[in-house]
Amino acid sequence: MVYATRTITHGTENVAMSGGTGGTATRIQSTGVAKFNPSIDQDSKDVKADARTHMTLQNPKKLTIEIDNYQYSDDEMLQMGFTKVNGGFVDSGSYAPFDIQRITTVDSEDGTKTKKLDVYFNATSGSYTESDDEDDDEINPKTYTRTLTVKGKDFGDGNGLVKQFTIVRTAKNATVFDTNESKILKPSDFKTGGA
């Protein structure tokens, strides 16, 4: 039996968002990300007939991301349904869609390290909840948690609705991969850079 090379993925860094879907808007860097937790939920339903299971139906996958931050930028406040008024924020209830990406580190059993990019398309954000830490005995930072719902985007390339794109940095795609520091990347960006 031959196993694949053993790897471990860890850390979350360089979390960034666009102001609109498709990676065409300005790249917004998120500061103070303490947790970035994608989760997929897919329910099934057994349909009974003739005293047995006739069929099992699968509901569509629901992709959400729970993010903990120690602070939010003005752009992130707008994503959560706030509008800036006179230097402060009011809850407008308008949730603009955006794309979000992050970098993780992949350690291999042979000692090599590389980066992995995860991009999520057409996300919307609910408002944040705030931790109730108090400074009784020691200083505890407030943690702000919000949940994103990822709806996906059709890029017109025959792949249908794309909710998530994941790629590991290689020597062949490094030039394109490294542009993640200046823009939100799409699968089509890697056509010329290779896999």
Sequence positions of predicted segments:
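Charged, amphipathic alpha-helical segments
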Residues: 72-93
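Short helix-loop boundary/capping segments
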Residues: 93-130, 134
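Short structured motifs
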Residues: 49-53, 131-134
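Oligomerization/assembly interface segments of phage tail-like spikes and tubes
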Residues: 52-78, 140-154
